[in-house]
């Protein structure tokens, strides 16, 4: 059983979390525990996973029991709630209005009733009740050690929001390129499209613009753009910095927002650059001494001051594929594949690369890696040893919701 209460201001934050997760999938899990209430969502191809954990201290009152019993059989039942996001989203659509008019909100769920009851208590004794029925489905849980990533950045969401405003509205992917002395946001990846019919945008930030800047690996990653916009909006509502954790192309990127009362993490698959992956073992074993020194100072007021740039780590991975009609490039690519096959010890369990390296078509050489969640729920652990090949697509719901 779950029973919790919120004020109007807390309802706005809770509703913004629901709106952000609606960009990931059309399904939402309520996962209560002793620590608090977690909202989870994963898209159909398992390339994007997001969860927001509200601490028990976030709510006015929080009551949870791990089991419930049916009146006729007295069998214990776990509370596993899977809701349709289209049923929940309209309840939290007008967040500014809810913040002003709602004095109290309660959320009650029971496993034997198969429904979640959300009640709003407003001024002048007005009460509004929503009954949302759920399916009994255990949520997907993953374990990803984001603190072990080579590159860790922390930036104020307003700066990144102003940067992505330069991108076109129909943008589907965004590229982050980092070196120890620079961060670059691009609308297209290294393998550019036809510039005669495309708009290419690029913006660079120095390390002094970040609250925390640690780059241990020169890299360039490409991932879906829509989820980035959603978590930036959520980060602004929380007035908390956005943390970015990533390594090399093909391994997931984590966008994280942490506060004393809640924690939000979005794990996104990135595009695989096959030539870069074959040469990545030359870049991975970096000693701590070769990493750029983390910067933990806020952006200075005097922008004219030029900061010292740490020595860059040479990038061994090529940014473009070898020409298809070049015999020398083709033989060089075959040599790299052979050498990578002999001592490839850098398997990444969190991401699975589609086995398409034998294809010659350029359209198949760079694909999204499907995230494979090594730690899943008990019903799915028996399949954890079998990678799931899939291509990342845009999130299930393309609907933009405004706060």
Curated annotation (Swiss-Prot):
Keywords: Phosphoprotein
Pfam families: Rad9
Residues with PTM Phosphoserine: 354, 363
Region (Disordered): 285-347
GO biological process: DNA damage checkpoint signaling; DNA repair
Membrane-traversing stretches: none
PANTHER family reported for this sequence: CELL CYCLE CHECKPOINT CONTROL PROTEIN RAD9B, DNA REPAIR PROTEIN RAD9
Homology family: Belongs to the rad9 family.
Protein name: Cell cycle checkpoint control protein RAD9B
Organism: Mus musculus
Lineage, uppermost ranks: Eukaryota, Metazoa, Chordata, Craniata, Vertebrata
């Amino acid at each position: 059983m779950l029973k919790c209460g919120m004020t109007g201001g807390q309802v706005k934050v809770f509703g913004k979390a629901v709106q952000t997760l609606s960009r990931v999938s059309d399904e939402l899990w309520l996962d209560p525990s002793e620590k608090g209430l977690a909202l989870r969502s994963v898209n159909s191809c398992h390339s994007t996973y997001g969860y927001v954990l509200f601490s028990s201290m976030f709510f006015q009152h929080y009551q949870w029991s791990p089991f419930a019993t049916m009146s006729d059989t007295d069998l214990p039942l776990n509370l596993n709630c899977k809701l349709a996001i289209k049923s929940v989203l309209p309840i939290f659509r007008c967040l500014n209005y809810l913040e002003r008019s709602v004095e109290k909100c309660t959320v009650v769920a029971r496993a034997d009733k198969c429904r979640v009851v959300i009640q709003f208590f407003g001024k002048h004794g007005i009460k509004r009740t929503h009954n949302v029925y759920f399916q009994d489905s255990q949520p997907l849980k993953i374990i990803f050690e984001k603190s072990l990533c080579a590159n860790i950045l922390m930036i104020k969401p307003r700066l990144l929001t102003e940067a992505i405003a330069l991108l076109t509205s129909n943008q589907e992917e965004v590229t982050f390129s980092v070196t120890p002395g620079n961060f670059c946001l691009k609308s297209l990846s290294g393998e550019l499209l036809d510039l005669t019919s495309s708009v290419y945008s690029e913006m660079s930030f120095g390390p002094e613009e970040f609250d925390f800047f640690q780059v241990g690996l020169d890299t360039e990653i490409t991932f879906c753009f829509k989820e980035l916009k959603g978590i930036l909006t959520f980060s602004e509502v929380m007035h908390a910095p956005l943390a970015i954790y990533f390594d090399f192309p093909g391994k997931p990127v984590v966008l994280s927002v942490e506060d004393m009362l809640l924690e939000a993490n979005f794990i996104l698959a990135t595009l695989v650059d096959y030539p870069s992956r074959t040469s990545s073992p030359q870049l991975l074993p970096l000693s701590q001494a070769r990493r750029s020194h983390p910067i933990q100072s806020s952006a200075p007021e005097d922008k004219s001051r030029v900061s010292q740039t740490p020595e860059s780590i040479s990038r061994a991975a090529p940014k473009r594929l070898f020409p298809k009609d070049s015999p020398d490039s083709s033989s060089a690519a075959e040599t790299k594949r052979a050498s990578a096959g002999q001592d490839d010890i850098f398997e990444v369990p969190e991401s699975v690369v589609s086995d398409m390296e034998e294809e010659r078509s350029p359209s198949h050489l760079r694909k999204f890696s499907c995230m494979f969640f090594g730690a899943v729920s008990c019903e799915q652990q028996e399949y954890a040893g079998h990678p799931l090949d899939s291509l990342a697509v845009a999130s299930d719901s393309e609907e933009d919701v405004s706060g």
